[in-house]
Swiss-Prot record:
Its EC number is 2.7.7.6. One of its GO terms (biological process) is DNA-templated transcription. One of its GO terms (molecular function) is DNA binding. This is DNA-directed RNA polymerase subunit beta.
Length: 1382
């Protein structure tokens, strides 16, 4: 079977279920294997959590291993983890949606409870009984048991989760990677503009550690953003002394006394830009550089090259230098100068006096090395380790006074214990690479060396070495996917369970305890349920169409727990970054306040095991582009020269040009082609799935491309799907990768096909052996999350041979395996009577008549039957006070029949609710006695269809509580479900039976078996039953053995089919678990047909959106010369200012595609002996230079006619992103189609028949109908709810609100002097409570009196003024009827 790109080979045939290969202008070669599974990001992440990963342990396993064993506080017993087991889901995905339950699997863990023999127990220690043989603790008893710890929501095959019957998606989150980050305030903190540097160590779990300079260049640290302390406190808390700190941060320079001064080693780097106050002399006393001369780095290097290794410093030249270690009087041991102190003139005298011959100085020159750590240390240089620990404790836990051991334990737990602090492997790798460390990856806590190196690097930044980190660089941001989120929640649940187990251990009698007594399965279930139900990243799946599903699963959000908030996110984090290239789409993002915070994964990008996004590139070796594809991280990419995919290469894949533009280090540079390391795999690798579906994307303004990407996700699946004539070649890929189509699991032959099932007999590659039966149950008229219709249709026929991953059934918005969100319509860009003012759209009535944009929407209505204190509610047909005509569409039970046409206020389910008995008046009792009328002691509580819905009932589900008697309708539904199970079972048995009996006949024939009474085997086979066949030829031992083996295999498969069937029936008969007090739930599904009408929103793929203003009769629409009316008129003024020229180019190419199809049709209709030759010749011209040209040449005449007939409606084109056809190529196609190469034609006015003055751009454009339907928005209210405070009607359709009569509307009435209307609007129609009651009374009485009182909003204003201590009183003056405010 061919894909949308076609397949070559001798005798090429286009199958009926294949899409016609597109005429593509792509030059680059796609790596299609990366596109087969677009939702791999979800699946891989979940599999890593639940399955076996690279280390041989899953995420679940590692959590259990970290938690167990659990010991009781006195060490008498221990609860050990042995293993875990994940069960099978109780119901399949379809059944969970239907029942409204969670699709989950039970998790059971095997625990071992060990109790030790003890001699004596005290709070200080436990004395154990020791086994004499092994010299180990003696076990009193050991109990092992498998325990359930709850259910884990399972990911479906579509990458979603079904929670309470609703499909949800866990969106991946972009967050700052664990590790260390260096930053500066960019001079914004202080008015002087001085840069203040800071560093932050971010763990995956645990306390944040910040380091920062202040304006005086003192270094401070903070823990969890609490009060800052000097960094010396932290270093001393780590056990470092003053000398240790100085040794760690400063190099030492040894000064040796000689006759003329101090002899010092000559270090080149110390003389960069230095101006000495004394002459620079060598050890011999020769002056090399005069005093006060600026020494540059070049001079210093020259002096070193000339052999200068030591120089002389005068005795007074050491003034102001910092001593590296204490200088001690050799005779008395008294300290002359303490470590870190500066040398003064007094000190110089003492040094000479005590004959100090050698001094170690700190290498601080105030230019390349500053005294920042030293100054910080001298803030409190006498502080001890204990003082530092207590000071840190006081900041974090103020108000407590603990002992030293508690303080040490607390400090150790902050950063150095894995239970409370976890950098994660990612954090450790980032820390190692940033700081040049070589710490083992499994060390996920901080070390002393880490902290010292962070401070060192911060000091180097202040000294002018290195650069700060870019937090928006994708090397510093990682993706947290679904598996990681669930793992974190799982860990939280297990930790809560651990605490409960430890509490229980302290109070339980061990002799009677079993492992199950310690575990409460609700703990984990509650945590997981909260996450899936209420987390910001667990979202109701966008299921409008297949594209919206795929996009939602590939979405990346910077919001959510541990992420940003939209209010605090600045411009930088939202902006496109150079590292987004090939990783995050620069186009697709929301338009509102979430812009830039929510983005989409680029089409070829994938996420590695550490959560960083990788992009693929083709390796270049010696100017030759190889087929080797390598995935690079953002951090790696900057080191290489990467050329664009559009770089010209010859037939040997060698670069044609000597110089190429490349990306390197975030910039574009021109380099020699020999230096190029990689080349992009495809021009479209920078965009997302949605953006890759926009033809001529490169001709559109980015803002409009963004709208186009977003609006494709809002397109409603139409009644009949139609693939675009002008696509991008990605339509097939997106459809196959979305899960909306049904793909064949294995090679095989279609054995049976109908509207609901496809049965395929699967074979091995050589078609020799049957591997089994694949039964595909199609989704028929199911309701999506957004009320659109999901309906799968088979595209294969009986007997078709299909290969693995072939499309065998289309879904909604799919046409022969290609994504089909809209329709190809004939468009004219012109104005028409002002009806296309401001992007309005004019539509032909013919489009409505042909149901071109008609869509089916499925509404779900639910009726709940409860048990009330007065008795149970009942579903019944005889509803009080309802005439028989209104009940005609209900069955005997009282539930609407499938197929019934229902409209506003139709009863869907008849239901009555008991009410308290009422005492009847005497006259009613008399009537009851005389006529025997039944008095209802119940009220009508039936399910009525809402006023804005009209449609056909397509399905009814009845759920009856287990133990409650089922009604006839639920029994009928159950019987139909069992029938479908029987059908599935029989399909499987039929296929297997047919295969095995064929194999049996072949075996008997090959063995030459003779059957008594038959001349040959064929006549025997024609008459023999299946049972007779199995007993034939058993006299031959070899044949009998083979037959026995075959029979065992056959019986095994048939037995398995029967077992599955019985399992399904048992589950169905088990009944339903309904909420407390609910007896029955009835769900009614109504299919509503939405025709196109004024007010509906439509759009193209280029951000060209508009609302239908008028549906014009087809005869009045402008028409072509042959009388064909245009389908749609767009305003030509909507193109220049929006700069989305792609729609015009699409129109031209669509015009060429249709006219080429018409020309092919004319050749076919003409017939004649030369037809095949003419056809081949014309198709050769169309597909000139295409791979498909050779396929067409290899076609037989019959195959060619089939292919040509499929092209009658138009030749499908592909204009891939950034590789669309140029003007000349479009003009060439227009000329080939024998139409004006300008793409414009003369149109005729349908009303007058006159030709328009000038030519008009006409062609075919792909238009989408969006989910903003006027039927869902139109709303009216007469009486409804009012606001509690203002007493004004609520607003909006969802609240059944009124229309706001605002300030400007009041001005309009004032302008016309409509005083009474204005008064009415502001009082009785709004918030005059007394007035509206009086109006109601006067209407009932038939009066025309009109009285209005004080509006409630006035009272609210008075109350607000009183709250400001302004007493406003309304006084009634005797002389005046109006009130005055005092």
């Amino acid at each position: 079977m061919s894909s949308a790109g076609g397949s070559s080979g001798p005798g090429y045939v286009l199958n009926d279920f294949d899409a016609v290969p597109r005429l593509s202008y792509a030059k680059s070669i796609d790596i299609r294997d990366s596109l087969t599974d677009l939702i791999r990001i979800q699946r891989d992440s979940y599999d890593a959590f639940i399955g076996i990963d690279r280390d041989g342990s899953s995420g679940i396993q590692s959590i259990f291993e970290a938690m167990f064993p659990i010991r009781d506080l006195l060490g008498r017993a221990v609860l050990e983890f042995v293993g875990y087991n994940i069960g099978e889901p109780q119901y399949d995905e379809y059944e969970c949606i239907k029942r409204g339950i969670t699709f989950s699997v039970p998790i059971r863990i095997t625990l071992r409870f060990v109790v030790w023999k003890v001699q004596e127990v005290s709070f200080k220690e436990v004395k154990y009984v020791v086994d004499e043989d092994t010299s180990e603790r003696s076990v009193k008893y050991m109990k092992e048991q498998e325990v359930s710890i709850g259910d884990l929501p399972m990911m479906t095959s579509y990458g979603t989760f079904i929670i309470n019957g609703i499909e949800r998606v866990i969106v991946s989150q972009m967050h700052r990677s664990p590790g260390v980050f260096f930053d500066s305030d960019k001079g914004k903190t202080y008015s002087s503009g001085k840069l203040i540097y800071s560093a932050r160590v971010i763990p995956y779990r645990g306390s944040w550690l910040d380091f920062e300079f202040d304006i005086k260049d003192i270094i401070y640290f903070r823990i969890d953003k609490k009060r800052k302390l000097p960094v010396s406190y932290l270093l001393k808390a780590l056990g470092m002394s003053n000398n240790d700190i100085l040794d760690a941060f400063y190099d030492k320079v040894i000064y040796t006394r000689c006759d003329k001064g101090w002899r010092v080693p000559f270090i080149v780097d110390r003389f960069k830009g230095v101006r000495l106050s004394y002459d620079l002399m060598d050890v011999d006393g020769s002056v090399l550089v005069k005093a006060n001369t600026r020494i540059t780095l070049r001079i210093a290097k020259k002096l070193y090259a000339d052999g200068l290794r030591e120089y002389m410093v005068p005795f007074s030249g050491i003034t102001g230098m910092f001593v590296a270690a204490d200088l001690v009087d050799p005779s008395s041991g008294a300290v002359i100068v303490s470590a870190g102190e500066t040398i003064t003139s007094e000190h110089i005298v003492k040094l000479e006096l005590f004959d100090i011959s050698e001094i170690a100085f700190l290498n601080i020159d105030f230019l390349t090395v500053g005294p920042y750590v030293l100054n910080t240390l001298f803030l409190d240089k006498n502080m001890t380790q204990e003082d530092a620990l207590f000071e840190i404790y006081r900041v974090l836990r103020s108000g407590e006074s603990p002992n030293l051991d508690a303080v040490k334990s607390f400090f150790k737990g902050l950063f150095f214990e894995s239970e409370r602090y976890d950098l994660s492997v990612v954090g450790r790798i980032k820390l190692n690479s940033h700081l040049g460390l070589d710490v083992d990856e499994n060390t996920t806590v901080l070390t002393k060396e880490d902290i010292v190196q962070v401070v060192k690097k911060l000091v180097l930044l202040r000294d002018g070495e290195g650069v700060v980190d870019d937090i928006d660089h994708l090397g510093n941001r990682r993706v947290r996917s679904v598996g990681e989120f669930i793992e974190n929640q799982f860990r939280i649940g297990i930790l809560r369970l651990e605490r409960m187990i430890m509490d229980y251990m302290s109070s339980v009698n061990f002799d009677n305890a079993m492992p199950c007594d310690f575990v409460n399965p609700k703990v984990l279930a509650t945590v997981l349920k909260d996450f899936f139900s209420s987390s910001q990243l667990s979202q109701f799946m966008d299921q409008t169409n297949p594209l919206s599903e795929v996009t939602h699963k590939r979405r990346l959000s910077a919001l959510g727990p541990g992420g940003l908030t939209r209010e605090r996110a600045g411009f930088e984090v939202r902006d496109v970054h150079p590292t987004h290239y090939g990783r995050i789409c620069p186009i697709e993002t929301p338009e509102g306040q979430n812009i830039g915070l929510i983005s989409s994964l680029a089409i070829y990008a994938k996420i590695n095991k550490y959560g960083f996004i990788e992009s693929p590139y083709r390796k270049v070796e010696n100017r030759v582009v190889t087929d080797k594809v390598e995935y690079l991280l953002a951090m790696q990419e900057g080191d290489y020269y990467i050329a664009d995919a559009g770089a010209a290469i010859d037939e040997n894949n060698r670069f044609v040009d000597d110089m190429l533009y490349c990306r390197h280090g975030g910039n574009f540079v021109m380099v020699k082609s020999e230096d190029v390391d990689y080349v992009d795999v495809s021009p479209k690798q920078i965009v997302s799935v949605a953006a890759s579906l926009i033809p001529f994307l490169e001709n559109n303004d980015a803002n409009r491309a963004l709208m186009g990407s977003n609006m494709q996700r809002q397109a409603v699946p139409l009644l009949k799907s139609e693939a675009p004539l002008v696509g991008t070649g990605m339509e097939f890929v997106v459809a196959a990768g979305s899960g909306a189509v049904v793909l064949a699991k294995r090679d095989g032959i279609v054995h049976r096909v109908d509207g609901s099932y496809i049965v395929i007999r699967a074979f091995d590659a050589n078609k020799d052996e049957c591997l089994g039966v694949d039964i595909y149950r199609l989704r028929k008229f199911q309701r999506s999350n957004h009320n659109t219709c999901i309906n799968q249709r088979p595209v294969v026929k009986l007997g078709d041979y299909v290969k693995a991953n072939d499309v065998i059934a289309d879904g909604s918005a799919i046409d022969r395996g290609e994504l089909a969100l809209g329709k190809n319509v004939l468009v004219a860009f012109m104005s028409w009577q002002g009806y296309n003012f401001e992007d309005s759209i004019v539509i032909s009535s013919d489009v409505v008549k042909r149901d071109v944009f008609t869509s089916i929407h499925i509404e779900e209505f639910e009726c709940v039957v409860r048990d009330t204190p007065l008795g149970p509610e009942k579903i019944m047909r005889s509803v009080p006070d309802v005439n028989e005509e209104s009940l005609s569409h209900l069955d005997d039970v009282g539930i609407v029949n499938i197929g019934a046409e229902v409209s506003a206020s139709s009863i869907l389910v008849g239901k009555v609710t008991p009410r308290p008995p009422v005492s009847l008046p005497p006259e009613t009792k008399l009537l009851v006695t005389i006529f025997g009328e039944k008095v209802f002691d119940c009220v009508d509580s039936s399910l009525y269809l809402p006023p804005d819905v009209e449609g056909t009932v397509i399905d009814v589900h009845v759920f009856v509580r287990r133990g409650v008697e089922e009604n006839d309708r639920s029994l009928l539904i159950k019987q139909s479900e069992i029938s479908s199970f029987v059908k599935e079972r029989d399909y499987e048995i039929d296929v297997v039976s047919e295969y095995f009996h064929d194999e049996l006949r072949k075996l008997l024939r090959n063995a030459g078996v003779k059957v008594k009474g038959y001349s040959d085997l064929d006549s025997f086979f024609a008459e023999a039953s299946d049972d007779t066949l199995w007993s034939t030829g058993l006299a031959d031992a070899k044949v009998a053995a083979k037959v026995k083996d075959m029979r065992e295999r056959f019986d095994s498969i048939v037995g398995e089919a029967h077992r599955k069937f019985e399992q399904k029936v048992d589950k169905l008969n088990y009944g339903y678990d309904l909420p407390q007090g609910v007896l029955t739930i009835v769900k009614v599904f109504v299919a509503v047909k939405h025709n196109l009408q004024p007010g509906d929103k439509m759009a193209g793929r280029h951000g060209n959106k508009g609302v239908i203003s008028r549906i014009v009769p087809a005869e009045d629409m402008p028409h072509l010369e042959d009388g064909t009316p245009v389908d749609i008129i767009l305003n030509s003024l909507g193109v220049p200012s929006r700069m989305n020229i792609g729609q015009i180019l699409e129109t031209h190419l669509g015009w060429a595609a249709v006219n080429l199809g018409k020309k092919i049709g004319r050749i076919l209709d003409k017939g004649g002996p030369s037809m095949i030759a003419d056809l081949r010749d014309f198709l050769d011209k169309i597909y000139d230079g295409q791979k498909l040209k050779s396929d067409i040449a290899s076609m037989s005449s019959e195959a060619l006619l089939v292919f040509a007939n499929r092209l009658r409606k138009g030749v499908p084109m592909a204009a891939p992103v950034f590789e669309g056809p140029k003007d000349a190529q479009i003009s060439k196609l227009l000329e080939l189609a024998e139409v004006d190469p300008s793409g414009q034609v003369y149109l005729y006015d349908g009303r007058l028949g006159k030709k328009f003055d000038r030519k008009i751009t006409v062609g075919y454009i792909y238009m989408l109908k969006l989910h903003h339907l006027v039927d869902d928005k139109i709303h009216a209210r007469s009486v409804g709810p009012y606001g509690l405070v203002t007493q004004q009607p609520l607003g909006g359709k969802s609240h059944f609100g009124g229309q706001r009569f605002g300030e400007m509307e009041c001005w309009a009435l004032q302008a016309y002097g409509a005083a009474y209307t204005l008064q009415e609007m502001l009082t009785v129609k709004s918030d005059d409570i007394v007035g509206r009651v009086k109006i109601y009374e006067s209407i009932i009485k038939g009066d025309s009196n009109f009285e209005c009182g004080i509006p409630e909003s006035f009272n609210v204003m008075v109350k607000e003024l009183r709250s400001l201590c302004l007493n406003v009183v309304l006084k009634q003056d005797k002389e005046f009827t109006s009130g005055e405010v005092e």
